[in-house]
Amino acid sequence: MAAAVNSGSSLPLFDCPTWAGKPPPGLHLDVVKGDKLIEKLIIDEKKYYLFGRNPDLCDFTIDHQSCSRVHAALVYHKHLKRVFLIDLNSTHGTFLGHIRLEPHKPQQIPIDSTVSFGASTRAYTLREKPQTLPSAVKGDEKMGGEDDELKGLLGLPEEETELDNLTEFNTAHNKRISTLTIEEGNLDIQRPKRKRKNSRVTFSEDDEIINPEDVDPSVGRFRNMVQTAVVPVKKKRMEGSGSLGLEESGSRRMQNFAFSGGLYGGLPPTHSETGSQPHGIHGTALIGGLPMPYPNLAPDVDLTPVVPSAVAINPTPNPAVYNPEAVNEPKKKKYAKEAWPGKKPTPSLLI
């Protein structure tokens, strides 16, 4: 004997009676709330169906606080071909129309009658399988010539109602078939075992930095957009020293040409030199038509002192010795040894 057992205790909540049997196909309940049809519940597969608030124990869940966990049972009598409703000692009762049923006492439910559970506003109406051919068509075959009048008066409303019921029933039946097909298919098909990943939580000791600019302040946010070039310091220093040496040597030559008279600095100028740039006593030269001071930053150092009496001996120069072209040409720097080759120091300089 099949029985519904409460999970919290070993006492059975409902004992299926021996007279219970499988109902005919197409038997169902119309669930109506107000004037709106919510759904159709098919009840043609089992001997009994349980109604209540507990979804684990009941076949149809009643989501209302006034209903008990296992509220009532709907059983089909195989000998009487009738449906019976049994209240399972519910707190707020089970109603057939407006009549409350006695607990644990089967009550016959006629077709098209309405039942309700507790204070729920949903009404459950017992229905048979809707007929494929409407009743008006069967009456046409019997009555013959009077069919047109009855068809106009009673045929259309009845056909529309039966068509709606048939549509709703087929919808509920198709839902049940799809559900059963999925469940049976799940039993036959062996699902491949999924390799479960390790569900344990592990922590890595190494910190993986994705954006270093968020951690290190020295790293810029736009470092990928900046191009860097490496210039060797040694090469730069060599270039700087070489350029400075050339400029310094050039300036020294310019200073030598502007201020120092060389070997013939003490001689008076000739007629061709009177129109050229004059040399000032205090180190001034005409640059761009204006006298500008130009100091000598690197004066020449004479290793052997020049005898002052040598210049005073011959105050008047020989005109044939001087060459005007040689005076205008740039003079090179000459040392004392090269300027006076073979000259020996006099005894007066050594004293």
UniProtKB/Swiss-Prot annotation:
Region ranges (RNA-binding): 330-351
Boundaries of every FHA domain copy: 49-101
Pfam families: FHA
Subcellular location: Nucleus; Nucleus speckle
Region (Involved in PP-1 inhibition): 191-200, 331-337
InterPro entries: Cell_Proc_Reg/RNA_Proc, FHA_dom, SMAD_FHA_dom_sf
Modification Phosphothreonine, positions: T161
Region (Disordered): 314-351
Motif (Nuclear localization signal 1): 185-209
Modified residues (Phosphoserine): S178, S199, S204, S249
Molecular functions per Gene Ontology: DNA binding; protein phosphatase inhibitor activity; protein phosphatase regulator activity; RNA binding
Changes seen on gene knockout: Mice display a retarded growth and embryonic lethality at E6.5, due to defects in proliferation rate.
Record text on subunit structure and interactions: Interacts with phosphorylated CDC5L, SF3B1 and MELK. Part of the spliceosome. Interacts with PPP1CA, PPP1CB and PPP1CC. Interacts with EED. Part of a complex consisting of PPP1R8, EED, HDAC2 and PP-1.
Protein's name according to its UniProt entry: Nuclear inhibitor of protein phosphatase 1
Annotated organism of origin: Mus musculus
